[in-house]
Amino acid sequence: MNTIFSARIMKRLALTTALCTAFISAAHADDLNIKTMIPGVPQIDAESYILIDYNSGKVLAEQNADVRRDPASLTKMMTSYVIGQAMKAGKFKETDLVTIGNDAWATGNPVFKGSSLMFLKPGMQVPVSQLIRGINLQSGNDACVAMADFAAGSQDAFVGLMNSYVNALGLKNTHFQTVHGLDADGQYSSARDMALIGQALIRDVPNEYSIYKEKEFTFNGIRQLNRNGLLWDNSLNVDGIKTGHTDKAGYNLVASATEGQMRLISAVMGGRTFKGREAESKKLLTWGFRFFETVNPLKVGKEFASEPVWFGDSDRASLGVDKDVYLTIPRGRMKDLKASYVLNSSELHAPLQKNQVVGTINFQLDGKTIEQRPLVVLQEIPEGNFFGKIIDYIKLMFHHWFG
């Protein structure tokens, strides 16, 4: 029997193992059910860090994740994202040739002294595909300048595009002043924002992201290894993303790895040593995979529930979600998950539009709601004909009178 609370109706549905649930932050391990037996977050030797699940977006661990820090060459992740978006839009192709200008020549630019380079020379004609690898694998500052000039006409214009995407992605603690990440006043980011840029790279420009797993690149007879040492770690399936270092920034690393269908992204900023940033990132990723799992309980178009509809050309409405639901939960707790839904009103009246929000799905663990998603109409339901609506009106009156 339905119980009405302030014109909202709650219907409890015990879900089978097909249903799962939400996020529990590892930063609050005390809130976990004791049978989960999740130890605390490992001690991480860095100024700031974060660990998120790629699909659910849930934060599993964090410390000083919103503190603004010098990103160093993590900046190149946004450079790469802008390039990937431009190629996705058809503005240029990997086979296009880029003529290298003087501003991308290390010898003529003292700011490049001692920094990571692809070793370009003025007048060279280099395919976009090679410059991208110079950025993503070799962390070449000269390659960043060459691609910025080619893609936007100037470095300043390209930086403007970078900051436009900062706004579009909703990043709260990031602003870029350079295309390469060398120290500059007013340039900053945070561990959280860098993890979100990594998430955007994987989601929005997968062709661009696929380059990050390549372990080496040779240009003009100079062979350089990918600076992300975790690519060689056989205990993790790491396929990206980017390192960064300046004296001011310390040692930074954003890394992503998969285990089955689960993908995690870690961001470590202000690490102490070159190898230390890898060790700390590995701690986070290993801990996340060992003690959490991400499940996909509801898919777009799959009916979660159905409800009677009044005054429509259909008697019932199929209800579900308008996008796939991913939930990150303590490993082994899926069997304990339940779900319920709440309608925004006690009755559904036609017309109803496809994807119209009519309520909320609550995912529950140990009796607590730990995640929510909008409950939507899966198919449009127009108004019924005149006689059908009259009949529904009479039925509804009896329903109100006699319950």
Curated annotation (Swiss-Prot):
The record gives the membrane topology as: Peripheral membrane protein
A molecular function (GO) held by this record is: penicillin binding
Pathway, according to UniProt?
Answer: Cell wall biogenesis; peptidoglycan biosynthesis
* Signal sequence range: 1-29
Q: Which InterPro entries match?
A: Beta-lactam/transpept-like, Peniciliin-bd_prot_C_sf, Peptidase_S11, Peptidase_S11_C, Peptidase_S11_C_sf, Peptidase_S11_N
The family database entries (Pfam families) matched by this protein are listed as: PBP5_C, Peptidase_S11
- Which class of enzymes does this protein belong to? hydrolase
Task: Name the catalytic site residues.
Answer: S73, K76, S139
Q: Indicate where this protein resides in the cell.
A: Cell inner membrane
Q: Which UniProt keywords apply?
A: Carboxypeptidase, Cell inner membrane, Cell membrane, Cell shape, Cell wall biogenesis/degradation, Hydrolase, Membrane, Peptidoglycan synthesis, Protease, Signal
Q: Which reaction does it catalyse?
A: Preferential cleavage: (Ac)2-L-Lys-D-Ala-|-D-Ala. Also transpeptidation of peptidyl-alanyl moieties that are N-acyl substituents of D-alanine; a beta-lactam + H2O = a substituted beta-amino acid
Q: Which cellular component terms (GO) are annotated to the entry? A: outer membrane-bounded periplasmic space; plasma membrane
Query: NCBIfam families annotated for this entry?
Result: PRK10793.1 (NF008059)
Q: What is this protein called?
A: D-alanyl-D-alanine carboxypeptidase DacA
The record lists the organism as: Escherichia coli (strain K12)
List the top taxonomic levels of the source. Answer: Bacteria, Pseudomonadati, Pseudomonadota, Gammaproteobacteria, Enterobacterales
* Gene encoding the protein: dacA
